[in-house]
Amino acid sequence: MRDQERTLNQDVERCINVLQDFLDTGSAKAISVFSNKTSENEDWLEEIRVKYRIKDNDELQAIKMLKQKRLDQLEALESKVDYYEKLCDELEEFQDEMEVKAKLEQNRRSRFDSMTRK
């Protein structure tokens, strides 16, 4: 019975050792892959950093202020365009009224001229 226990313990220890080796190998592979990807990402980050210069906060603030200034100017222009469009509509309406009045005046004159000739 002691031999069976010893054999069983040895078998369990071998299983533990095999399992530990498997886990160690898997962990080493995962760490290696992680290290490679980390290294690749660091290289890529450096490549990006060189290619695209990151602006400092003062420069970003200046850009935001310029953008806001341009938006304000655009809004002012849009309001002027709206004003001139309305003014144009009113002028067209006035022109139409003047044409009608001119025709009425012409008709009156023509009637008046025809009455004075008789």
UniProtKB/Swiss-Prot annotation:
Its main location: other. Transmembrane segments: none annotated. InterPro entries: BLI1. It is found in: Endosome. It holds the Pfam family BLI1. One of its GO terms (cellular component) is endosome. Residues 55-104 form a coiled coil. Keywords: Coiled coil, Endosome, Transport. It comes from the Eukaryota. Component of the biogenesis of lysosome-related organelles complex-1 (BLOC-1) involved in endosomal cargo sorting. Belongs to the BLI1 family. Component of the biogenesis of lysosome-related organelles complex-1 (BLOC-1). This is Biogenesis of lysosome-related organelles complex 1 subunit BLI1. It comes from Zygosaccharomyces rouxii (strain ATCC 2623 / CBS 732 / NBRC 1130 / NCYC 568 / NRRL Y-229). The gene is BLI1.
